[in-house]
Swiss-Prot record:
<keyword id="KW-0408">Iron</keyword>
<comment type="similarity">
    <text>Belongs to the NRAMP (TC 2.A.55) family.</text>
</comment>
<keyword id="KW-0472">Membrane</keyword>
<dbReference type="InterPro" id="IPR001046">
    <property type="entry name" value="NRAMP_fam"/>
</dbReference>
<protein>
    <recommendedName>
        <fullName>Metal transporter Nramp6</fullName>
    </recommendedName>
</protein>
<feature type="transmembrane region" description="Helical">
    <location>
        <begin position="321"/>
        <end position="341"/>
    </location>
</feature>
<feature type="transmembrane region" description="Helical">
    <location>
        <begin position="264"/>
        <end position="284"/>
    </location>
</feature>
<dbReference type="GO" id="GO:0070574">
    <property type="term" value="P:cadmium ion transmembrane transport"/>
</dbReference>
<keyword id="KW-0406">Ion transport</keyword>
<feature type="transmembrane region" description="Helical">
    <location>
        <begin position="427"/>
        <end position="447"/>
    </location>
</feature>
<keyword id="KW-0812">Transmembrane</keyword>
<keyword id="KW-0410">Iron transport</keyword>
<keyword id="KW-1133">Transmembrane helix</keyword>
<feature type="transmembrane region" description="Helical">
    <location>
        <begin position="71"/>
        <end position="91"/>
    </location>
</feature>
<feature type="transmembrane region" description="Helical">
    <location>
        <begin position="143"/>
        <end position="163"/>
    </location>
</feature>
<dbReference type="GO" id="GO:0012505">
    <property type="term" value="C:endomembrane system"/>
</dbReference>
<dbReference type="Pfam" id="PF01566">
    <property type="entry name" value="Nramp"/>
</dbReference>
């Protein structure tokens, strides 16, 4: 395999579309322009897309279909389109600047705001891990009849299992998990054929926004939170740094374009899976000939009861197959969640932990509320906790989204690759709508809570003052991020060079090695 060494650099360039450098664990993208280069960029988008088909998504999809049939499909469409735009911006930030979102936040904000953003990001990682914990517990319950609360405790051991499997190579493990996850997707596609949802109703639900019935707004926010996750923005901006791309204007543009295409393909698959789950749940649970037993399951549908939806496809094996895929979904999401947690801690605090320790700490924080709810409320309570976790993610999204939008619109950070006026307008409209929906739901729900409360007047007043103070603080924090001007500093001096001129920059070996827990990490200068 022919290779050449770039002048004045240790970087190897090859005509092969995909090379992994064993010394740095980075994937090298050749200088020569070719459509085959696209294969060098495959990976980050699909890793990120795992979060869109995790147990939290399955839970919210199942409940929205069972309760509102196809009425909330438009949320999936809007969220998927928004996710594609937002995730592409996260990838662009990493590609253009050579730093991921958390590192930019550390460089941009003073100590107190930076620390608060780190805390919020860590809460988002833990909230994302809660559905994985509960989903895994449900899977163990279906496979081995283990009580849910014991299954929650056993999820703490998944860290050791994952570390053992990762010795065979992280990519092989991810391929196996992706295969199992898409097995359940195939089952839902086939079940979609058997359940025969009305195409007109499905299309109407996809393209006509509607929020009818009690709880529709809350479930819509849960769907939004399950689709557009804050930790994914940190994750995507860091994963792209594992590629050593030509640092020319044309090389960067090519990388951004290919990452957009890859993200589009990955999110299209995730979109089809989510639409299929909602459509199957809506068609089966709203059928006129539904048995009393299945109707009871639909009224309180969660991951632990959903296997009956696959009965037409795999018969008596439906619960086992669903459990295996649910287990795979939870564990694959655990891997990406671990990466996101590492990048968040490294970026905000310049602190790195061993992957097994990082995973264990996050999992312990997620186990505590999951265990309490599972003991008190059983599987039904655990299912509701998934919805709450998704809502938390939605409320935390602005604290990752606003910095991302401001950084990618900054000429000093992105140079000629900064967002255009159209892209900036579209992304700020998307962000504004998300924040507006969250604030409306938060205020209206809190007012309803106060009006229908049976507490005495003093307690209601105290709770009202406390609650509205919290809402005011939330709004003030978002306003600070939106209105604050970016620092006038640039780390992208190479962007002013000609299209053909290439500058070699320090490879992000620290980022590449963070994805390979079994190898020694390189701790180097981030600049």
């Amino acid at each position: 395999m022919a290779a050449e060494t770039a002048s004045g650099s240790n970087r190897s360039i090859s005509n092969s579309p995909l090379i992994e450098n064993s010394d740095s664990n980075q994937i090298l993208v050749p200088e020569k322009k070719s459509w085959k280069n696209f294969f060098s960029y495959l990976g980050p988008g699909f890793l990120v897309s795992i979060a869109y088909i995790d147990p939290g998504n399955f839970e919210t999809d199942l409940q929205s279909g069972a309760q509102y049939k196809y009425e909330l499909l438009w949320i999936i469409l809007v969220a998927s389109c928004a996710a594609l735009v937002i995730q592409s911006l996260a990838a662009n930030l990493g590609v253009v600047t050579g730093k991921h979102l958390a590192e930019h936040c550390r460089a941009e904000y003073s100590k107190v705001p930076n620390f608060m953003l780190w805390v919020v990001a860590e809460i988002a990682v833990v909230a994302c891990d809660i559905p994985e914990v509960i989903g895994t517990a449900f899977a163990l319950n279906m496979l081995f009849n283990i009580p849910v609360w014991i299954g929650v405790l056993l999820t703490g051991l998944s860290t050791l299992i994952l570390l053992a499997l990762q010795q065979y190579g992280i990519r092989k493990l991810e391929f196996l998990i992706a295969f199992l996850v898409f097995t359940i997707a195939l089952c839902f596609f086939v079940e979609l054929h058997y359940s025969k949802p009305d195409p007109k109703e499905v299309l109407y639900g996809l393209f006509v926004p509607q929020l009818k019935g009690n709880g529709a707004t809350g479930l819509a926010i849960s769907l939004l939170g399950a689709m557009v996750m804050p930790h994914n923005l940190f994750l995507h901006s860091a994963l792209v740094l594992s590629r050593k791309i030509p640092r020319s204007v044309t090389g960067i543009k090519e990388a951004c374009r290919y990452y957009l295409i890859e993200s589009g393909l990955a999110l299209m698959v995730a979109f089809l899976i989510n639409v299929s789950v909602i459509s199957v749940s809506g068609a089966v649970c709203n059928a006129s000939d539904l048995s009393p037993e299945d109707r009871a399951s639909c009224q309180d549908l969660d991951l632990n009861k959903a296997s009956f939806l696959l009965r037409n496809v795999v018969g008596k094996w439906s619960s086992k197959l669903f459990a295996i895929a649910l287990l795979a979904s939870g564990q694959s999401s655990t891997i990406t969640g671990t990466y996101a947690g590492q990048y968040v801690m490294q970026g905000f605090l310049d602190l790195r932990l061993e992957p097994w320790l990082r995973n264990f700490l996050t999992r312990c924080l997620a186990i505590i509320p999951s265990l309490i709810v599972a003991l008190i409320g059983g599987s039904a309570g655990a299912g509701k906790l998934i919805i709450i976790a998704s809502m938390i993610l939605s409320f935390e999204l602005p604290f990752a989204l606003v910095p991302l939008l401001k950084f990618t619109s900054s000429k000093t950070k992105m140079g000629s690759h900064a967002n255009s006026l159209v892209i900036s307008s579209v992304t700020w409209i998307i962000g504004g709508l998300i924040m507006g929906i969250n604030i409306y739901y938060l205020v209206s729900s809190f007012i309803k809570l106060l009006l229908h409360s049976h507490m005495n007047l003093v307690a209601i007043v105290f709770l009202g003052v406390l609650g509205f103070s919290g809402i005011a603080t939330y709004l003030a924090a978002i306003s600070y991020l939106v209105l604050r001007k970016n620092r006038e500093s640039s780390s992208t001096h190479f962007l002013d060079f000609s299209n053909s001129q290439t500058e070699e920059t320090l490879p992000r070996e620290d980022i590449a090695n963070m994805q390979l827990p079994n190898r020694v990490a390189v701790i180097g200068d981030l600049n």
